[in-house]
Amino acid sequence: MITDWPRLPPRPLPQSVTAFRDETVYSFTTRLAHANRIPPQSLRDYAARESHYVDPERLARLSGYPRHVLCARLRGLTADERDLTRQRARARPICRYCTARRGVPQPVHCWLPDHLTVCHRHGRWIGPSAQRWDDQMSLKHHPAVARSARAHHALAKRNAPDI
């Protein structure tokens, strides 16, 4: 573990990673650390500095993204979303083909609404039971599940438009 980080303000790391909408801070910092060959916990400690939570300003400098972009895309930067246990419990990996399409080779964990259970673009199950990429089953032979998921999503949007 790196314990002797410089006391100077952080500079952007050499490698950046894509920040996905509703991605957890834990997932983003893990991917950023792996891209730069740094232990993830060391990067989180450096981004947090004195507090136990990642500081949005420090993370913005390290990642190369503007602060407002990170605050808009990442979940876990505000006081009510910071709890790491809550982030792990609420997060699910998004469709592995969607991440591969954007050139991301590792899982991206996002806070997905409960009604979002299928990636319709790739026909993959991404519901709450899909906690790993291996759990994302193809629905090619289960068209009724995909149709039901689409109807459920439309119903949720109609009755709760802010979702």
Where are the model-predicted features located?
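Solvent-exposed, non-transmembrane amphipathic alpha-helical segments
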Residues: 49, 79, 115-118, 139
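Short linear functional motifs in flexible/disordered or boundary regions
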Residues: 44, 107, 130-132
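Short functional micro-motifs and their immediate structural scaffolds
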Residues: 100-104, 124-127
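A structured, charge-rich N-terminal accessory region that forms the first stable segment of a protein
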Residues: 1-91, 110
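A contiguous catalytic/ligand-binding core that recognizes phosphate-bearing ligands
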Residues: 101, 112-113, 120
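Domain-exit/linker segments immediately C-terminal to small folded modules
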Residues: 12, 120-163
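Short, cysteine/histidine-rich loop/knuckle motifs that typically chelate Zn2+
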Residues: 94-98, 118-121
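Short linker/helix segments within small regulatory modules
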Residues: 106-115
